[in-house]
Amino acid sequence: MVLVNAISEKDYIKDSRRRKKEEKEFEKLRKLLVEGLEDIVRDKKVLKAMFRVPRHRFVPEYEQRAAYTDRPLEIGHGQTISTPHTVALMCEILELSEGHKVLEIGTGSGYNAAVMAELVGKTGHIYSVERIEPLVNFARKNLEQMGYDNVTVLLENGSMGYPRYAPYDRIAVTCAAPTIPKALLEQLKPGGIMVIPVGDYSQELIRVKKDSNGNIYKKRKGEVIFVPMLGRHGFPRS
């Protein structure tokens, strides 16, 4: 029995050292990735948040080695985690600050929510809506393991938003809609900003600003590719 315990302890120490080495390697790769984003994103707060969030902890194990490449990765159920440069760009467009209350449509693995959580701080909160239950569970586990207690993941169809906690300072949509859903515009606080991809095969990232009088202003921010939004204000199921 003593011998078994000794071997187990030895294996534990060996495994612990291996994991620490891997984490250091991932940190180096993350640093290189963030440095590569500096030509796309100028907001230093966003870049720091991107460095603080370990992307490899938000993808399936078989994708971890590719976590710090600037490309989308599969997370199962026909869904993907967005490219790091897209996540950073959307966060920059949103102009996130301490204390903001944010609605996210499309949680995925929880990675985007984690980056936004870094930017809104402990006094802010992210309400993230996801329609696929296994991804809700995956995201909750990832966020809990990383200590993000300022993120709430909700099992809902996001095409209607989430009126319970409205209005929101910011709304981030990580799936492409045919048009900007009226429900989301209504849930955006005056002075608030929303970022949303619009279109089917050819999508554009749109920055939406609501002024203090409720007037809506839209600005195109470039071409993107996202999975489609499904539901009442999304695309029909194929």
From Swiss-Prot:
EC number assigned by the record: 2.1.1.77
Subcellular location as annotated: Cytoplasm
Residues the record marks as active site: 82
Pfam families in alphabetical order: PCMT
Catalytic activity annotation: [protein]-L-isoaspartate + S-adenosyl-L-methionine = [protein]-L-isoaspartate alpha-methyl ester + S-adenosyl-L-homocysteine
Keyword Amino-acid biosynthesis: no
Database matches in InterPro entries: PCMT (IPR000682), SAM-dependent_MTases_sf (IPR029063)
Alphabetized Gene3D superfamilies for the sequence: Vaccinia Virus protein VP39
Name of the protein: Protein-L-isoaspartate O-methyltransferase 2
Species this protein is from: Methanosarcina acetivorans (strain ATCC 35395 / DSM 2834 / JCM 12185 / C2A)
Gene: pcm2
